[in-house]
Amino acid sequence: MDNSILYVNACVRKASRTERLAKKLLERLGAPFEEIRLEELEFPGVNEAYLQRRDQLLSSGEHQDALFDLARQFSRAETVVIAAPYWDLSFPAALKQYLEQITVVGITFRYSEGGVPVSLCRAKRLFYVTTAGGLYVPEEFGFGYVKALAQGYFGIPDVKKIEADGLDLYGADAEAIMTSAEEALACIRPIADAQPGAEPFSLIPALMTAADIGEKNE
């Protein structure tokens, strides 16, 4: 589907603030989306038998096997939105399992003769949406990991983090912080306006933070 959005939802709470912010982003993008709720998936256990089967399927070129359904789905998306709350310096474990499932040679990337990953994905934009109760949110284990994988393997040039933090600090007005984060989405280009060549993509991803917007977001 043209202008398709893949929405990868790693949230688990019914009143998830991350999910709330992600839904506002989807409204802003203004295109149909397909949602994956990671809590509803049963990821296979990674053991020797699983790895042997996976390697056998890949070596024989059986990329249509159900084991690679998630990878094929990801490779077809033109825009990706990942909603992942900030947990323990990173993100929920289910997201790591998902990323392992979609990182498949011959589907989402291939290796060049020099051993360099080359993208097989269609996506040009990926949004990583997250919220945090505190302010100490180092990005290298969460967004930084997703960014490196998205750009280095999947060839997605435009990777942005959309966040709201400090929500649970003493005296914080969580609703005001959320509202500011939602209002800041006005600077995101809707899908209909994001035509190829309309805006140059940098290999260094843009990072949408409170510093860029002038207010604290989550």
What is the role of each PLM region?
Residues 1-104, 183-218:
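N-terminal beta1-alpha1-beta2 submodule of the flavodoxin-like/Rossmannoid cofactor-binding fold
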Residues 99-102, 106, 130, 154:
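Short, well-ordered alpha-helical segments in soluble proteins
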Residues 36, 129, 162:
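Hydrophobic residues at beta-strand termini and immediately following loops
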Residues 104-114:
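Conserved nucleotide-sugar donor-interacting segment of glycosyltransferase catalytic cores
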Residues 11-14, 133-137, 167-168:
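Short histidine/acidic/glycine/proline-rich micro-motifs that form metal-
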Residues 112-154:
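Short, glycine-/small-residue-rich phosphate/pyrophosphate-handling segment
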Residues 137, 144-218:
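Glycine-rich phosphate/pyrophosphate-binding loop and the adjoining helix
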Residues 44, 90-91, 136-138, 170:
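Short acidic/glycine-rich loop or secondary-structure boundary segments that cap or lie
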